[in-house]
């Protein structure tokens, strides 16, 4: 569990670092103290469950003010052991993103990659991250949404929406949750 928490933190920092921009002038930095996080199951899965945390992350990453978050869970699904977007998954993404782009709203997208519980936890974590990145890449290529207006990370197998004992339940757990922050 501690390894998963550390991996989530490191990969989040890497994604934030990749979306930064270069500057010709001096860069201003802010100093802050990292809060101490208790190592409980709730603390580990909290990034994948709490819309208030999604809203706070978006404001921290963009320095903008947002007023609410809406979660779309279960529409963007994946085949077993895959992060390739199907035609159905692309349609589901389009249904969420196209109206936002057309309305020219200020919004931020959080993409949470999930897996079923089949396989090793570390492998599932990477697969969830690859799924979030696939959705992020599609949105960037299809709509030109700047990468700094998106954040993608993995929840791995930690937040199932269905029972993993049955094939149908495992299929429902292979997904990316889209959180729209406006």
Please place each PLM-identified region on the residue numbering:
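Bacterial N-terminal signal peptides that target proteins for export
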Residues: 1-8
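A short, structure-level motif marking secondary-structure boundaries and short turns
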Residues: 3, 82, 120-122
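C-terminal motif of bacterial Sec signal peptides marking the signal peptidase cleavage site
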Residues: 17-20
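Periplasmic peptidoglycan-binding/tethering modules of Gram-negative envelope proteins
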Residues: 22-108
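Periplasmic OmpA-like peptidoglycan-binding domain that tethers envelope proteins to the cell wall
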Residues: 114-182
């Amino acid at each position: 569990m501690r390894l998963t928490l550390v991996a989530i933190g490191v990969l989040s920092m890497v994604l934030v670092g990749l979306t930064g921009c270069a500057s010709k002038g001096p860069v201003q930095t802010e100093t802050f103290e990292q809060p101490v996080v208790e190592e409980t199951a709730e603390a580990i899965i909290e990034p994948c469950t709490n819309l208030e945390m999604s809203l706070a992350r978006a404001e921290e990453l963009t320095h903008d003010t947002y007023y609410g978050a809406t979660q779309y869970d279960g529409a963007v699904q994946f085949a077993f052991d895959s992060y390739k977007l199907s035609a159905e998954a692309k349609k589901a993404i389009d249904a969420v993103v196209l109206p936002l782009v057309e309305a020219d709203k200020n919004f931020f997208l959080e993409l949470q990659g999930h897996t079923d519980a089949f396989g090793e936890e570390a492998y599932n974590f990477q697969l969830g991250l690859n799924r979030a990145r696939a959705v992020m890449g599609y949105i960037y290529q299809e709509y030109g949404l700047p990468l700094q207006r998106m954040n993608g990370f993995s929840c791995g197998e930690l937040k199932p929406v269905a029972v993993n004992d049955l094939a149908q339940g495992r299929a429902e757990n292979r997904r990316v949750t889209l959180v729209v922050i406006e």
